[in-house]
Amino acid sequence: MFPVKGLSVSADKLKVEPGAIVGTAPAAPAPASAPAVSSSKPSKKRKRHGGDKDVNVDASNLVDLWEKVIEQKKEGVADGVKKHENKRLKKEHEGQGEKLSNSNNDGNQGERKNNKKKNKNKNKNQGEHGIQVAQKKGPKKVEGEEDEDDNNDDADEWEGIDEDEKHASSEKPTPKKDDKKQQQLQQQQQQKKQQKNQEKDNRNGTTSNWQQDKPQPKTATPAPKLTPLQASMREKLISARFRHLNETLYTRPSTEAFKLFEESPEMFTEYHEGFRRQVDVWPENPVDVYIKEIKERAKVRFAPKISGGAEGGKSLPPARFPLPRDQKTKVCTIADLGCGDAKLAKTLVPLKQKLRLEIHSFDLQTGGCELVTRADIANLPLPDNSVDLAIFCLALMGTNWLDFVEEAYRILRWRGELWVAEIKSRFAGSQARVKQPPQKKVVAHSVGKRKKGSALAVAEEEEGDPEQNNLDLAVHVDGDTSKLKKPHETDITAFVEALKRRGFLLNRDFGDNSVDMGNKMFVRMHFVKAAVPTRGKCVPKDGQEDTTKNKKGGQKPKPKFIEEKDEQEEVKDEAAVLKPCVYKIR
C-alpha cells in the first residue's frame, strides 16, 4: 500500500474494498469526520498540496498525484467537466478563431469583471506560494489548511486570466508607478547637487567644467539678421576700412604704426579681416606657396650635384635643395617677419619635430595668437646670426622698409636665405634709381625733322643702340629670347640692386628659378646672405676706414666733377624703389 503522511492505521482494522482491482493494496479508510469519497470518481475540488489525504492512491492516479504534489504541475481538467471553460481555453491556446455564442458570452462577462479584482491579490499570494514550494520542495502540512480549502471551492473555475498571464503577472517586479516615482526622486537629487556645486563655484569665483567647455562666441561675427542691402553695405565698409588702414601703414614709418596698433589693438583685427577678403580673390596665396616649399625642402638632406645657374648649368627648382640649417644642431630656424594671423606658424608648428624646424613670428600686434611676438620689424628681439631663413611675405610696408632688410641681414647666418614676396604694382623699375636729366626732343613741327633723307637721321638709323643690336643678333642666330623683356613684365632690377648693396644676392643655385613671376599678382624672389653690405647699419667699420685710404696710408683724392650730395639723393631714390599703395579718393 502506498504510504500517506499523517496516517497510522493498524493492519487489523484494514478491510478490502468491494470491486477493488486484484493485486492492488486497499486504500486507507478515511476518518469519520471526513465525508465519504467514492473510489470511482475523484474529488472535483482543486485542493492545495497539503490536502491530499482524502484522495485514494491507485495505479491509475499515481502519476497524476506525483506530478501534482511533488513536481507542482497543475492538474488538467477531466473530460466532461467544465465543457464551456475547456472549450474556451482550447480555442485560445490552439489559435482557433471561433467565437462562442452570445448567450454564453453574456453570462461569463459579469464573472470576468467581478473576478479580475479578486484575482489580483490571489495571483500575488499564489505566485509567492509557488516560489516557496519550489525552494522547499514539498513543505509540511500545516493545521487549519482544510478550512482554507473549503473556502476556495470555486478556484477551478476559469476567472478570465490565462495561465501564461498569471505567470507573467507574478514575474513583474514592481509596477510602473513606483518606477516613475524613483526616477523623479533621482532627478530631484541631481538638481540639488548641481545647485550646491554652482553655489560653491560662485563663492570661490570659479566656474564649473561644463561652463568652461562651452565655446565662446567670436568677436568679429557678422550680425545675425541683415537684409541684403545691409550685408552689401557692411562689405563695402569693411573694404573701405581696410584701404584706409593699408594706406596708413604704407605712408608712415614702422615706429608710428607700432604706436597706432598699441593704442587701438582692434584695428589690427579689422585690417587682417579686410586683407583676407582681398587675398581670397587672388588665384594663389604666397603664404601657401612658402608652406609647401618648406615642407618639400625640409625632407631633402643633400644638395644635387649639378648646380643651376652658377656656371651656365641647368637651373633646378628650389624643391631639389635642402633648407639652410645650423651646422651643430641641424635645425632650421625660420623668422616670419610681418606674419599677420601666423598661418605659416600654425601649419608648421605641429610638424616642427618631424621636420626639425624652429619658427619665430613677429608683427605689430599679436591678434590674440600665442605664436606671435609683438615687435617692430626694424628692431627685432633676436641675437645676431641666429636665423637660417627670413621671410617677408607682403610685409615690406612703411617708408623705412630698407631698415627691415638691414635687420634681416643682422639676424641671418652666413649663407642664410631671404624670401621676399611683393605685389607687382609696387615695383617702380630702374627709372626710380637715378634721376636722369630731361632729354632734348625734336619738336614734331620743326623744319629739320621734315627734311627727307637727312644725313643725321640716316646715320642714327644705321648705328642704332649697340646693346639692342646684340640682343637682336642673339635672337636671330642663337635663338636666345631669355634676355628680351616682355612689354608687360615687371622690372625688379632696382629692387635687386638695392638689396645687393645691403649684402643680399639672388640665389645662383636656383638659376632662373630664383625669381618667380608666374603669378599675375605678386613676385617671389630668393636671396642669399653672401656679400658684404656697402650701405646701411650692417656695413663693417673696418671696411669704411679702408675705403677712405690708399695703399700708402694717405687719404684718397676725391674724384672730380662729382657732387657730395649725389649719395644722399641716391639713398632717397632707393626708398622709392617700392611704391606705396595709395588709393584714389572717390
From Swiss-Prot:
GO CC, one annotated term: nucleolus
GO biological process, one term: ribosomal large subunit biogenesis
Bias (Acidic residues) ranges: 144-163
Gene3D superfamilies: Ribosomal RNA-processing protein 8, N-terminal domain, Vaccinia Virus protein VP39
Bias kind Basic and acidic residues: ranges: 65-83, 164-182, 539-549
EC category name: transferase
Predominant subcellular localization, coarse grouping: nucleus
Biased composition (Polar residues): 99-108, 204-213
InterPro entries, sorted: RRP8 (IPR007823), RRP8_N (IPR042036), SAM-dependent_MTases_sf (IPR029063)
Keywords assigned: Methyltransferase, Nucleus, rRNA processing, S-adenosyl-L-methionine, Transferase
GO MF annotation list: rRNA (adenine) methyltransferase activity
A Pfam family reported for this protein in Swiss-Prot or TrEMBL: Methyltransf_8
Biased composition (Basic residues): 114-123, 550-559
Comp. bias (Low complexity): 25-41, 183-192, 217-229
Family that this chain belongs to: Belongs to the methyltransferase superfamily. RRP8 family.
Protein name: 25S rRNA (adenine-N(1))-methyltransferase
Protein source organism: Chaetomium thermophilum (strain DSM 1495 / CBS 144.50 / IMI 039719) (Thermochaetoides thermophila)
